[in-house]
Structures are given as structure tokens and as C-alpha cells.
Amino acid sequence: MGKIVYLMGKSSSGKDTVFKELMKEGTMDLRTIVPYTTRPIRAGEENGVEYFFTDETGFQTLKEQGKVIEDRAYNTVYGIWRYFTVDDGQIDLTTKNYLMIGTLEAYEKMTAYFGTEAILPVYIELDDGVRLQRALDRELRQEKPKYEEMCRRFLADSADFSEEKLAAAGIRDRFENTDLTKCLKDITKYLNCLLYTSDAADE
């Protein structure tokens, strides 16, 4: 049976970079599950790579069709932004392993949908001061920086990824992203061990 490797972490902890590097490795034969969002596309993003970008009408249509596995809504200073996972044919756990990024709330919903055995959580940590600087640097590169939203998201993460919630979700293994090379090495070793052990047990 295949697994879904689920990357989590606070904003600007380096999840996107870790995701791209793990996919670049190619040694674990991980496939992507591209989530959907109604937020505006950022500079440097491409539709269908980090996310499928849609609007509220598109979300409601998929919801009515019963294709939304999990969804989250954030009341931002620019209106409601939704992030969601869709049962659109991307996921086949009979033989394939997948890699995706999400929130703790989404992880719990994915676990409820697919089962605990199908999901491998990978929680990425980084000092708050470093995260805040990274978030600011990213906004400065945008054509129209959204500083208010950056601050809202930074503060919301403290509640969304509180120690109590992490413990309740059963998140134990954590990976410090101060040094990207070491972080990637640790995650790769962790996943190779678990995916290999899982495959061997299924044979």
C-alpha cells in the first residue's frame, strides 16, 4: 500500500523549498498531490505546480460534486481564501507514494479520510525570528506586498501549530530547518526508512 508524506510547518518555515528539493531527489519515487486554493497567485508561482488556482465558484462546484476531501477557509484582510484537497484522480494508494504540503488541521482530515496508516507526517520547525524575516523578504519581492496578511498569518500560526494541537494530532518527529542541507538529509533518511519498512512489510 502506498503512503502520503505530509509536510507541515508554520509559514516561512521552508516547506515549499523542502518539497521542491525532495521531488528533485527522485530517489523515493514520490508523486505530487497538487492542492487547490482560491487565493491570488503569487509572483513566481505556476498554476498546477504549487496549487491549482480557482475562485469561490469553482470551489462551490467541486463541493457540490462531493469531490472536496478537506478544506480550510481563512478570513484574510483581502477576503476569504480557501485551501482544499480534491478527489480528482490524482491519488492512487494501491502502489504509489505521494508528497504534499498542508496544515495540521488538513493533516487530521486527510488521516480521517485515508486512515492513519496511509499518512506519514513530516513537521518542519524554524525559529520564529528567522521565519518572520523570511516572510518579510518574500513580501518585498512581490509586486504588491501584503504586509497585513503576512502579520495575520504569522500570528495565526502560533495558535494553529500550538504544542497542545501538535500533541493531540500525534506529531512526534520534527525536523529543524536552520540548515537546509541537514534538514533534507534527515528527512530523506527518515522517509527511506519508513517507506522501505512499509513496503517490505506489505510483501
Task: Describe each region flagged by the PLM.
Residues 196-202:
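Conserved small/polar residues in nucleotide/adenosyl-binding loops
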Residues 37-98, 102-104:
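ATP-dependent small-molecule kinase phosphotransfer cores
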Residues 140-190:
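Small-molecule kinase domains that catalyze NTP-dependent phosphoryl transfer to phosphate-bearing small molecules
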Residues 7:
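Hydrophobic anchor at the beta1->P-loop junction of P-loop NTPases
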Residues 99-103, 117-135:
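Conserved phosphate-donor/acceptor-positioning beta-strand/loop module used by diverse small-molecule
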Residues 13:
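ATP-binding Walker
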Residues 10:
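P-loop (Walker A) phosphate-binding loop of NTP-binding proteins
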Residues 16:
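Walker A/P-loop
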